[in-house]
Amino acid sequence: LIAQDNQATILKKELEAKTIAKDPKDTANKTWKKGGFFSLNLSQSSLSNWAAGGEDYAFSVNTAFSGFAFYKKGKHQWDNTININLGYINNTSLGARKNDDRFDIVSKYGHEINAKLNFSTLFNIRSQFFDGYNFPTATTQVLNSSFMAPGYILLGSGLDYKPVKNLSIFFSPLTARWVIVNNDSLSKVGAYGVTPGSKSLFQLGAFASINYKANINKNVSYIGKLDLYSDYLMNPQNVAINMNNLFAVKISNVLSVTYSLDLIYDDNIRLFGPTKDAPRMQTKSIIGAGLLVKL
């Protein structure tokens, strides 16, 4: 019996000395959640002595990156997202041009009011990386945009409603918005609504942003965003619209088919119509097959 007692005491001390290692996959106490995806779509064709006709050579590449970092601790929430799209096309008749170019960064801090409602402050910056051109003819190009020309900076506070998982509806009745035209030739002609010679336009108005993502089934997913802005200072009835949609159909672990549809309307973007001085609804759609990697 004495021997058994001694053995039990030894085992007890050994157990007390051991520490239980935490499973690295255990995220119960993590305050940060991070992720995203990267996609790459390529296409190429070439013809030689082809009786049916067509471009002798055509090549295109489109890339997209979407990342997020969400923080939550107690009643505090901090949501950060970044979206980058770049596209390039080259063919025999038109030469090299870009067909996609944008970055969009959003940072939103919220304080929880209840399980579905936060009081939040949102910051957003949106623009492009490279020069953009109109092509009146196949050999003539006219600069119409550049890095931060236009650029949009937005700051506002309001309510962030999250009725269900993966749906966020943010509304701010008073939001400051700056339109930046950081290019001398574009600011000189008053592009994008700025006073000729000025490089910025200040706006004050109401802002709403709806963000939604869903797995339609195990192979089909959707990410959507709709931003609406009404400027109290000038023509509040002409609401600026910026909408992004992305559908992805999974083929394998790394291959997929993607379809994106973007819609933009801004009364200050007056580059269209017969005399190139009127606003229009802008649309961009891209479909492709290629690499899709979740991060």
Predicted regions located by residue number:
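Residues on the lipid-exposed face of transmembrane beta-strands in outer-membrane beta-barrel proteins
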Residues: 36, 40-42, 63-71, 105-111, ...
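Extracellular loop and loop/strand-boundary signature of outer-membrane beta-barrel proteins
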Residues: 50-55, 90-95, 138-145, 192-198, ...
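Membrane-embedded beta-strand positions of outer-membrane beta-barrel proteins
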Residues: 36-40, 80, 121-123, 157, ...
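Outer-membrane beta-barrel channels and translocator barrels
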Residues: 72-74, 110-116, 164-166, 176, ...
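Transmembrane beta-strands of outer-membrane beta-barrel pores
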Residues: 40-46, 73-75, 84-90, 125-131, ...
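Outer-membrane beta-barrel "beta-signal"
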Residues: 281-295
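Sec-dependent signal peptide cleavage junction
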Residues: 2-37
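Outer-membrane pore/translocation modules
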Residues: 97-205, 282
